[in-house]
Amino acid sequence: MFSSSLLSKDNKSAVDFHEIPLKQTALDVLHAVFGYQSFRKGQEEVIDATLMGKDSLVIMATGNGKSLCYQIPALCFEGLTLVISPLISLMKDQVDQLLANGIEADYLNSSQTFTEQQQVQNKLMSGTLKLLYVSPEKVMTTSFFHLISHCKVSFVAIDEAHCISQWGHDFRPEYTQLGGLKSCFPHAPIMALTATADHATRQDILRHLNLQSPHVYIGSFDRPNIRYTLVEKFKPMEQLCRFVLGQKGKSGIIYCNSRSKVERIAESLRNKGVSAQAYHAGLETSQREQVQRAFQRDNVQVVVATIAFGMGINKSNVRFVVHFDLPRSIESYYQETGRAGRDDLPAEAVLFYEPADYAWLHKILLEKPESPQRQIEALKLQAIGEFAESQTCRRLVLLNYFGEHQQKPCQNCDICLDPPKQYDGLIDAQKVMSTIYRIGQRFGVHYVIAVLRGLSNQKIKDNQHEQLSVYGIGKDKSKEHWQSVIRQLIHLGFIKQVFDHFNATLQLTENAKPILRGEQPLSLAMPRISSLTSVVAPQRYAIAQYDKDLFARLRFLRKQIADKENIPAYIVFNDATLQEMAQYQPTTKAEMLAINGVGATKFERFAQPFMQIIQQHKKVLTQHEPPLSLES
């Protein structure tokens, strides 16, 4: 286990922290312990500031190596590092990964038995721990301070720091107590970290935590390997199933806004042959843990969940995240989509949308008592609505929201890959508006379309609407076409949806009059009916060339090892590391240690069978024989 020395990656000789500068020590830790050849952008800057004893605020996108920003200083400093984390599952996941890298780490939280907590406390007293993960509600208690007073706390890291801000999307009252940490540990640098914080949230974090002249690092919010796609809902369940089946067994998360919908979607996917499980607060704790464990270990392909799922998971090979319903803020959307592609390999973020989703959330919000918090939530809901309705590059809209201004479209979102085609939509708009007006502005989307298309049903007959002049004036176009037209007219402010309990009626706004009179032109986007049947277009994100057959064999071996060790597969090696192995095909110790993600401890613990598989594979290629079985 890692304590106050480490092994050089090249010669494995001991390195004494007192004989070399801390900056060099940090680089040695990166190489020998974590197995990476160089720092990512921003990591070295943040680590250097911490090693100089400065407080810091780190805003860094998920998947960009945020955890290393505090884990490496923790190993460079003498003494203990406290890591404050809001989620029990996240603590365990981080500790498991640190242990796999040979680092003495543990956690204290309410899920542990008295005996387990005593064991952790004994480690603290003996001075063997380098990192201790604790919850925000526990860290400020008298009993914890009595315990920790016997330790040398050299550094404090606060993860998910946006939780301290009421302006943030995930405000947690217990985080507000953390402002006292600076007075409790006056000589320990404090690092606050988050992946999602706009300007107002950042200012709240700095103020509430009492950080002293902090180093502030704001990295790019861009996740170039994630493609953002919006799908208009026409037949949403059919569209969703078709998309998931097109993923061919890849790991994914589907978010919904209700437990009942979660259960329905999970069942529908299972009926289609997809390995899918539901996850929500209505399940027993043991059931939720079982689903989470199965997903982490690649025994379940898809988890359909409410927003509670995923925050505590560091699963690196999630290939897609689907929002079946509109999130309540861009921060939530960004954080949840950020759970895809954490290994830097191509991933999908798909948002299913219709204007009624936004209108319903807005109605629920207005039912809350008037307060500053409601005003904040309203602004955030408006922003995610504008994102969904945008006709410009979705990545630019996201980045602009977080204050990162770029001009060049990304070429990796639905708008860039398939720009909306415009047509003269004045006649279509007049047909829709006239129908809404003639039926008394008392009916919803489906009824308006039924009248437009001249359908014959009992409700239309009862209302005698088949006698109206507008009846059937849109029969030459499909239901999906008129759905798209109505949505665009809502976006443009010519029509509004009015909710009354569970019914939504369409009504004209004042802006509709010039359109009805033909006094102004109107361009509309051609309806994207193709999204009903097509799987999302191929990725344009650059992918390294590697041996696909060898990669599959390495993945299979990894699963066998992970099951035997009773750990998630990505803790052995993540997909990016396996792809690098499949590309460079290392067969010696030096070659394997040059692969990103292979550190000294992981090499000793896991690498040998991977090198054997690679040697077998290379031998087969030279002999032109069929690949050998893994069991051979």
From Swiss-Prot:
GO terms for biological process: DNA recombination; DNA repair; DNA replication; SOS response. The gene is recQ. Belongs to the helicase family. RecQ subfamily. InterPro entries: DEAD/DEAH_box_helicase_dom, DNA_helicase_ATP-dep_RecQ, DNA_helicase_ATP-dep_RecQ_bac, Helicase_ATP-bd, Helicase_C-like, HRDC-like_sf, HRDC_dom, HRDC_dom_sf. It comes from Pasteurella multocida (strain Pm70). Requires Mg(2+) for helicase activity. Residues 47-215 form the Helicase ATP-binding domain. It catalyses: Couples ATP hydrolysis with the unwinding of duplex DNA by translocating in the 3'-5' direction; ATP + H2O = ADP + phosphate + H(+). This is ATP-dependent DNA helicase RecQ. Pfam families: DEAD, Helicase_C, HRDC, RecQ_Zn_bind, RQC. One of its GO terms (molecular function) is DNA binding.
